[in-house]
Amino acid sequence: MSGNLTQIEQDLRQSSEALQDLRSKYDGALLKIGEANEACKTELESKKTEALEALEASKSEQNVKIAALEGKMEELKSRFITDDNQILIKVGNNADEGEIASLKEALNLALQYAPSVPQSVTREKNRVVVEIQEGWEWVEAIGLYHIDLSHIILTQKNFDVPIMCDFSRENMHADNGLLVKLYLDNSKISIKKLHLKAKAKELTQNACWFNNYIYSRFGSGVFIEHLKLDSSLLTTANCGQAGDYTIFTDDGSQLLAHKIEIIKSNATNEGFCVCENSRAYVEYLTLSGGNNNYNGVFINTASSAYVGNITISGNSGHNGVLISTASSAYVGNITISGNSGHNGVLINAASSAYVENITISSRSGHQHLLVDGSRLTNHASCNFTGGSTGNNQKLAIVRGGLATVAGNGYSRGAGNDANQAVGVWSAHGSWCFYGNRT
């Protein structure tokens, strides 16, 4: 019996010790769990604090960026956006007033801002305007290749004060033997009003036949409200070669203009040219000033033109108006008061023309009007009051030409005798008069 009690006592003692050991392990485990929880809590709080601090820093950084962006927007708005919600970029010499010195830079900037104008804005206001300020001089040439700037309006603040243009070779765009101030290759541009005047320059120094203000080719388009080109200060010691070609539309290009004024000089070769399957629509075309070397107006090689009024003063070395090589033209009025070295109006080489009124009050070296293998319809009047030199023929039709004069035809004076009447001359061609002829 005593042996059993002893065994029970030992078993209880061992169980108690095991329980104490288990209790100790349990307390140790709880302590470690508490320590782990505390460590996790501390780490979590630390990460939370770091995240909040990073968030606040990011918000602060974003606020700085937003403030900078808002400031930039306000700057751009005050600098460029007008009351009409147009974007106005000024080209000039006053950087403090936000003016940009480079026209090329201004056009690039305009090209960037153009898509940002809201579509909800009306068409009259949905545009970007590049405005040249008074006193700015055009030095850096511009070449446009495969770019459409027709939605950007190029203009100047004061049309009465010309923009002086540097025609030095190093400041002209060179391409395929051409020197040009504004060159377009498969490109488009819109001009509201520009008055350009070339600075004094001897063009033989450029070693180039073609010196132009604007030359467009290869499917380009030029849209003009009012353009005035003044070449009166240009000179050349090599007449007929190194010269000025003002504005030239070439190689399948288009010209749409309300009014173009050209002031020629002895350095001007062609006054106004539309060539190589090109198209032109001009309401008012005026040529004045000095004596150009070739033609006043030249429409050539399968080209076509509508010109409301052509007015030419100042002599033309060859022809006042030449329509040539399968070209066609409608002209409302041709008025020539400057002498022509060859013909006042020449239509030749399978070309055709419809002209309402032809008035020539000056002298022509050959004929006032020559239709050579071509067709002319003169609807209203054909009035010649100036004498001719050379063969003294006022009206001439040759080599299969046909001229229809539906209005009154006048032929008065020849050579140096304004009272000497002259008839109509025709060789292998025919006139058809529907009005009076004196």
Q: Model-derived features: where do they sit?
A:
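Short, low-complexity N-terminal tether/leader segments at secretion or assembly junctions of large
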Residues: 1-75
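Generic short N-terminal amphipathic or hydrophobic helices
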Residues: 7, 162, 298, 309-311, ...
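Cysteine-rich, disulfide-stabilized extracellular repeat modules
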Residues: 40, 51, 62-65, 96, ...
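Right-handed parallel beta-helix/beta-solenoid
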Residues: 71-113
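Flexible, charged surface loops at secondary-structure boundaries
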Residues: 82-85, 121-125, 146-148, 183-185, ...
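N-terminal extracellular ligand-recognition/capping segment immediately after the signal peptide
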Residues: 95, 104-105, 115-177, 196
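Glycine-rich beta-solenoid repeat tracts in large extracellular/virion proteins
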Residues: 142-146, 163, 173-185, 202-218, ...
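Right-handed parallel beta-helix
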Residues: 155-157, 188-198, 218-238, 251-266, ...
